Design a protein with these regions (language model features):
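C-terminal regulatory/interaction regions
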Residues: 4-12, 16-24, 255-257, 262-297
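Metallo-beta-lactamase
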Residues: 19, 87-88, 98, 101-115, 119-131, 146-206, ...
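Conserved beta-strand hairpin/beta-sheet module of binuclear metal-dependent hydrolase folds
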Residues: 19-27, 33-113, 216-231
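Short, P/G- and charge-enriched loop/turn segments at secondary-structure junctions
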Residues: 56-61, 142-143, 204
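Residue-level marker for buried hydrophobic side chains located in beta-strands
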Residues: 80-82, 124, 154, 226-228, ...
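Metal-dependent catalytic neighborhoods of phosphoester/phosphodiester hydrolases
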Residues: 133-144, 284-285
Length: 297
């Protein structure tokens, strides 16, 4: 089992899968929370635009549209949300940097599933970059920052938490304390210490190339495994081994992690669920004469 410790409090469209975990049915929804845009050069790092632009669209300002999907997993007695999108509490100046677009919201997507924020029992944050945890905290009627999911326990890896508290200069703009400190102060934040099973059929594994302690969910049953790849593979276009995101803090480690994961995904025919690819929601890994590649499902 995954080892969890607890923090001490201070004074859109869905893709539905059902997996039988041997105890009950897991209902899995890939839900949309809206889109944002980032520079293609930053997203694809050292890969020349002449190559990546054949695989992913950019506008005349070199901006690529990116989805912000969350994963909703429902079991008999748990409703687990993985990531919360960018949220809506930041000011207009902040949002203007990221060209938000799309009609979907996290609240609206949950409503389409017949759920309210109060129904969520667990919120897993893959990491604490603003586009993954911004919706974890909201303003209440009195203007106080409070957990958006009042009945939920929140989870993040211990390594990511420490990384966010002491960010490096390169990553600092991605960490906004108002997105996660209110969770700690409310006493509802728990820390994942190691890889392991969160609930039956639902395993969390850590990767460290993009950022320290990135949590990646694996959902398995009867020989089928779905992986919500988060920023391990932002787009299907990032599957080729040397196509490493420019935002990754340890690109050589990303290469190692990708090589091992892609070989595993190929051998086991994993279904990959993409969080940021605006055009491909699900895919598989194949091997060609050029190496690992992705095929959309």
């Amino acid at each position: 089992m995954v080892d969890i410790t607890f923090g001490t409090a201070k004074p859109g469209e869905t893709s539905i899968v059902k997996l039988n975990d041997g105890i009950g049915i897991m209902k899995i929804n890939l839900i949309d929370t809206g889109n944002f845009m980032l520079d293609g050069g930053a997203i694809f790092g050292v890969v020349p635009k002449s190559l990546w632009s054949q695989q992913y669209k950019a506008n005349d300002q070199n901006l690529c549209n990116m989805a912000m999907r969350s994963l909703l997993v429902e079991t008999e007695n748990r409703k687990i949300l993985v990531d919360t999108g960018i949220g809506k509490k930041q000011d207009e100046k902040f949002f203007s940097y990221y060209y938000l677009n799309g009609q979907e919201t996290l609240e609206g997507s949950l409503m389409e599933q017949g759920l309210t924020p109060e129904d969520i029992t667990d919120v897993i944050l893959t990491h604490l970059h603003f586009d993954h945890c911004g919706g974890a905290v909201v303003y209440d009627a009195a203007g106080n920052l409070v957990p958006a999911f009042s009945n939920a326990k929140y989870y993040v890896s211990r390594q990511q938490w420490e990384w966010a508290l002491h960010p490096n200069a390169r990553e600092r703009p991605s960490y906004r304390p108002e997105n996660y400190m209110p969770l700690y102060e409310a006493g509802c934040l728990a820390f994942i210490e190691n890889d392991g099973e969160f609930v039956p059929g639902f395993t969390l594994r850590m990767f460290h190339g993009h950022t320290a302690g990135l949590l990646v969910p694996f959902l398995s049953s009867a020989g089928e495994t779905l992986v919500f790849v988060s920023d391990l593979l932002p787009f299907m276009a990032h599957i080729p081994l040397s196509w490493v995101c420019g935002y990754d803090t340890r690109p050589l480690l990303t290469l190692q992690e990708k090589e091992a994961f892609l070989a595993e995904a190929l051998e086991n025919k994993y279904r990959l669920l993409f969080q940021h690819d605006a055009y491909v929601r699900e895919g598989r890994v194949v091997k060609t004469e050029k190496g690992f590649r992705g095929v959309a499902l």
